[in-house]
Amino acid sequence: MRCPFCGTQDTKVVDSRLVSEGAQVRRRRTCIHCQERFTTFEVAELQMPKLIKSDGSREAFDEDKLRNGIIKAIEKRPVSIEAVETAITRIKEKMQATGERELPSRWTGEAVMEELQRLDQVAYVRFASVYRSFKDISEFREAIDRLESHSVSIPKSKKTAPESKKEDQA
């Protein structure tokens, strides 16, 4: 690796360790020529699939565009940036796991909706209203009904337990 101080190619790795939960390698290096020390970070470069837009054109995956769309949906909602970054990471991992070189842009939109459904239901409805181009209030109602039917319901064990005992005795 080229020394950033003197430009010589002759450097030596002094220390290496994993950082960012194993996603990066941090290396301390020393230049053999000028003796300066510097740090480098290595990250695996993974090729993201290209996105096929509805008009048939192809576009490179743009993580910033994905992030901005999610941030717009969660605006003024109690969702942390860490949660957004985790959602983005999950979407990217799912994209890569498909093994495809190209995916319809619709795939990304659906993946965002799936993540927003986990993060914040209001953000989900906001995103869905733009993504699916809601025309009237009934489409909002349908999205909310879908959310309610897919959300995990907590059993009311205290109320249902005595009733089931009464039914068993009858």
Swiss-Prot record:
Q: Has keyword Ribosomal protein?
A: no
Q: Which GO terms describe its molecular function?
A: ATP binding; DNA binding; zinc ion binding
Q: What does this protein do?
A: Negatively regulates transcription of bacterial ribonucleotide reductase nrd genes and operons by binding to NrdR-boxes.
Q: Which family does it belong to?
A: Belongs to the NrdR family.
Basic and acidic residues: compositionally biased ranges? 160-170
What keywords appear on the UniProt entry? ATP-binding, DNA-binding, Metal-binding, Nucleotide-binding, Repressor, Transcription, Transcription regulation, Zinc, Zinc-finger
Zinc fingers (unnamed) span which residues? Answer: 3-34
User: What Pfam families does this protein map onto?
Assistant: ATP-cone, Zn_ribbon_NrdR
Which residues belong to any copy of the ATP-cone domain?
49-139
Task: Extract one GO BP annotation from the record.
Answer: negative regulation of DNA-templated transcription
Among InterPro entries, the record links this protein to: ATP-cone_dom, NrdR-like_N, RNR_NrdR-like
Protein name per its UniProtKB record: Transcriptional repressor NrdR
Q: Which cofactor does it need?
A: Zn(2+)
Disordered: annotated segments: 151-170
Binding note for cofactor: Binds 1 zinc ion.
